[in-house]
Amino acid sequence: MVVIRLSRGGSKGRPFFNIVVADKRVRRDGRFIERLGFYNPTAKEGEEGLRIAQDRLTYWKSVGAQVSDTVERLIKQAAKKAVAA
């Protein structure tokens, strides 16, 4: 099964997450199929904290990829920001 989830990067105390499409059996930070965007929880004002390639996200969902709960929450957050802007 293919899943859209977060893959952690960054250093200790400074997390940075890539939003990736990966096989469910592969470890969290392991091999992935495609990188769809990123999430920076420590982004300051004026910095981009979240970017998602909506066209690729739609494609992967259409071919049956499951979205993790956290990524689903981030997608909704990005949609709210897009409407507000």
From Swiss-Prot:
Q: Which terms in the GO cellular component ontology are assigned?
A: cytoplasm; small ribosomal subunit
Question: Which keywords label this protein?
Answer: Ribonucleoprotein, Ribosomal protein
Q: Which InterPro entries match?
A: Ribosomal_bS16, Ribosomal_bS16_dom_sf
Q: Does the keyword Ribonucleoprotein apply?
A: yes
Molecular function terms, GO-annotated: structural constituent of ribosome
In Pfam terms, one family for this protein is Ribosomal_S16
A GO biological process of this protein is:
translation
For this protein, the record's PANTHER family field holds: 30S RIBOSOMAL PROTEIN S16 (PTHR12919), SMALL RIBOSOMAL SUBUNIT PROTEIN BS16M (PTHR12919:SF20)
Homology family: Belongs to the bacterial ribosomal protein bS16 family.
The protein's name in its UniProt record = Small ribosomal subunit protein bS16
Q: Can you name the source organism?
A: Paracidovorax citrulli (strain AAC00-1)
